[in-house]
């Protein structure tokens, strides 16, 4: 049996061993002479110590921190020690022969506080485990190598001004990465480095508090406090860190408003209307926001009735405005007091009040030219209708309030009385009618009267005058509408045919009740019964007569009850018709069959159809004629004969390409008569002609014809020759024939009767000319 002892030894130079631990372990052993294995209880010779490695320790060589040893190791070199686990082979190495464990670099507890490893002894030759692996821990022992830090710094805090001593402002917290369970490396103490005597800090909790009372924001609004955290309980040698706390004092309403001056003086012209700004007052309040809001008011007195004051929402100014019209002649100055008060008052600071202030205000009224003032804002007048022109309607009056007063002149603005129904006296404002008024045409007349100062036409004012036309009984009653009624021939006696209504254009209440009466007597075909409400019922007294061509005309008399009473007569038309069983009209003989001209409906339709057909034919014919005329006119407009130039001539001069005026060709009858004076020659481009067939009778006739055409061309060059041969005095440069002057007219100087050489030699272009001048017969075809 092999007994194993595991020893963890501490290095004498400062590495600590925490104790020895012995534990029995079972071991298997074989005995000669026994048939099976025998279980023996042997002593497990392990001594277990926990390792501690000081962090940040470093040396020139790896540091021995412990040793592994087994009692099976006889020192013969047959045992090999193995180390596995966290950091084995890199941070920790083991000597396989001796079991010494070394650390190869300095360790940081804040990165890793402990390492768990496995140790095992094996046979060097066969690598057979001599014992099971055993786990042990190497702890990194902390040292004070980390200063406190404030992870949330720098801090910003707010505390109300005028806070009591000890008011909590903010809590700061520092963090120390060292081991809080080992020594005082992580025990922190807070102190104030800068910010005394205004603030203090709790050494243990880091709560910052106010240290003095009545800190005023208006004196100092912001404070910078420096807080330090020191480990090792604040003792010497400890590490420290600091942060800043910016403390801002928030505003409270601890200051009343104050007027910078006790008396304000303003001036305003008397013509300033209500709402006109007189001046601004400013009560100063050093507080902020809602705590600085100020409300202004006028204390009881003479000023509160004439002036008003409000607060400007932007600048917190007091806006003094006019409330009622001012009059320099009545009062020239006002003196009153204005109070400024905080709108929000904190009861906690009433001891610093009162939160209001008072100032005096004096307003001087300045004189200004004023327009005339009417005695009333509007005037309402009345005049009866049908009165003669010049009837008095009423009078208006205006006065000049200035001193001295100026005379007033009155006039009616034309746009308010376009029909010139009224007139006004310019000096006293008396209004009279200019025409007879009719209430039924227009009830109200709205005039605009202009009052102007005689000394200053710029000073004027206007007033509205409403004139009502009063009613008189001047309209006779009449029927509300024309009545054209039909009644069935089968109607029963006493049947109501129609309710006839009357209309009186006079005003209701002016005896406008209307009575109606129809024909009376035994011969009356219809009965009219007055309903005494402005209407009458038309009744059938007996069975109606058979239908007839002419309708019944019933006279109706209408009268009112005015003074004097007015009456009129109207006619109601009643036709007797045949009706269907449902009561609707079927026909009224003969009006239903004939038109007013005596023609039937079918005849009228036939006549209208024929007239429409004839009218359509006429329109179609005119349209076709217009279309044909337009087509001819288009061809005439597009006549381009004057632009056609023949280029197959023998000449080459520019004068040969000039076209003649086409106007005379288009209108030969309108050609101008031959002009007086010397003959003017006009050369035009010759055109190629085909040989004439048959041949002219003789050369003498042709010569006579050419002479006639030549004379016409010489006397009237504006008329182009249609059928004549043009004679050129010069063929143009570059021609193989030279000049053709020998063919010039007889009127030219030096002209000869014929060409000097045979024309047949000149080619086919001159064949016609050769035939005209030649004596021989043309060649046979």
Swiss-Prot record:
Signal sequence coordinates: 1-22
InterPro entries: Cadherin, Cadherin-like_dom, Cadherin-like_sf, Cadherin_CS, Cadherin_Y-type_LIR, Catenin-bd_sf
UniProt keywords, alphabetically: Calcium, Cell adhesion, Cell membrane, Cleavage on pair of basic residues, Glycoprotein, Membrane, Metal-binding, Repeat, Signal, Transmembrane, Transmembrane helix
Domain of life: Eukaryota
Start and end residues of each Cadherin domain: 46-150, 151-259, 260-374, 375-479, 479-592
TM spans (from-to): 604-624
Coiled-coil residue windows: none
Pfam families for the chain: CADH_Y-type_LIR, Cadherin
GO MF term list: calcium ion binding
Pro-peptide positions on chain: 23-44
Comment on protein domains: Three calcium ions are usually bound at the interface of each cadherin domain and rigidify the connections, imparting a strong curvature to the full-length ectodomain.
Function description: Cadherins are calcium-dependent cell adhesion proteins. They preferentially interact with themselves in a homophilic manner in connecting cells; cadherins may thus contribute to the sorting of heterogeneous cell types. Cadherin-24 mediate strong cell-cell adhesion.
The protein, known as: Cadherin-24
Lineage: Eukaryota, Metazoa, Chordata, Craniata, Vertebrata
Gene, per the UniProt record: Cdh24
